[in-house]
Amino acid sequence: MRLSPRSLCAAVRAAWRESFPLEGRDVARWFPGHMAKGLKKMQSSLRLVDCIIEVHDAQIPLSGRNPLFQETLGLKPHLLVLNKMDLADLKEQQKIIQHLEREGIKHVVFTNCVKDENVKQVIPTVTELVGSSYRYHRGEHVEYCIMVIGVPNVGKSSLINSLRRQHLRKGKATRVGGEPGITRAVMSRIQVCERPLMFLLDTPGVLAPRIPSVETGLKLALCGTVLDHLVGEETLADFLLYTLNRHQLSGYVQHYGLGEACDDIASVLKRVAVKLRKTQKVKVLTGTGNVNVIQPDYPAAARDFLRAFRSGLLGPVMLDRDLLQGRSAEES
C-alpha cells in the first residue's frame, strides 16, 4: 500500500529525535579577562549614565541574557532592544513581550539594525525613560549619556551605527564584527543624536560567568555569542538540524536542494559537502601502504550550515519557542 504524501511526512517526523542528547556535554565557558574587566568598567561609569540600553538577539529573547547586568547596573532606566528581528520568527511576539513583562522588563523594541528597521523608536523611548526618572548626580546637564550593554555579537555596535545614520546622517563610529569579542573595552562617548544631544557608550559583550544550562549554551552558540570551536561546529550543526526539524522548518531542504528533510547530521553534512564541492584528502592505511582518499569535508559543511542559518538563508527561526510554550529540550 502506498502512503499519501501527508502520511509519508508524518511517518518521517515520527522517526525524528524527540529530544537532543544534552547529558555529558560541557559547554565551554567563554568569560576571558576582557569580559570581567569590561563589567567593572561599566560599573565605574554608571555615575555618568542616564539610561541603559540592553541589546539581545531576537531569536533567543528569553535565553542567555546576563543576570549580572541587572545586579550590577542598578536601578537605571532600562530599554531592551531585541535585534536581528529579521532572523527571528516573531509570530508569537506578543507572548514574548508578556513573558518579559513578568520578568520586570517593561520597555522592549524589536529592531533590525542592518536595515535600520524600528531603530527610530529607540531615541524617543530613551528620552521618555530618562525624562520620567531622577537623574542621579547629573546636575543640570542637557545631554544624555546612554550605556549600551549585552552579550557578545548581538548588534550593540550595529545599533550605534544605525542610530548615527538615522539621526546624524553619519557613517560608522564603531567597528562591527560577525564574531564575539570585537569590542574589547568600554569606549569613549559616541554621539548619536543632536536633538536631544545624546551620547552612547559602546561596551564589550559580557556573558554570564556560568551558562545556566547546556541547552542555553547551545542556543547562545548558534547565535554566535560564543566561538563555534568551543562547542564544536558539528555539534552546533546537529543541534540546529534537530531544532529545525522539531519546529517543522524545512528551509534547509530548499536552500541546499536536499529533496527531503533528514534527521541524521552526518547524512545532511555529507550531502551539503557534495553539493558545495567541499572535499578533503585523507590518508588511509591499506595493505599496500598509504592511499589518498577523497572524503566530504564535514567541518566545512557544518560551517556553511551555520553560516546559512545566521544569514537568514534557512528562514526565520525562534530558538526559544519551547520556552514560550513552557517546555525545554530536556523535558520534550
From Swiss-Prot:
Q: Does the keyword Aminoacyl-tRNA synthetase apply?
A: no
Topology relative to the lipid bilayer, per the entry, is: Peripheral membrane protein
What highest taxon heads this organism's lineage? Answer: Eukaryota
- Pfam families (UniProt xref): MMR_HSR1
Alphabetically list the UniProt keywords. GTP-binding, Membrane, Mitochondrion, Mitochondrion inner membrane, Nucleotide-binding, Transit peptide, Translation regulation
- GO cellular component term, pick one: mitochondrial ribosome
GO MF terms listed in the record are: GTP binding; GTPase activity
Location in the cell reads: Mitochondrion inner membrane
Answer yes or no on keyword GTP-binding. yes
Question: Some GO term, biological process aspect, for this entry: which one?
Answer: regulation of mitochondrial translation
Question: Any idea which positions bind GTP?
Answer: 83-86, 153-158, 205
Q: How does it assemble?
A: Associates with the mitochondrial ribosome large subunit; the association occurs in a GTP-dependent manner.
Name under which the protein is recorded: Mitochondrial ribosome-associated GTPase 1
Q: By which gene is this protein encoded?
A: MTG1
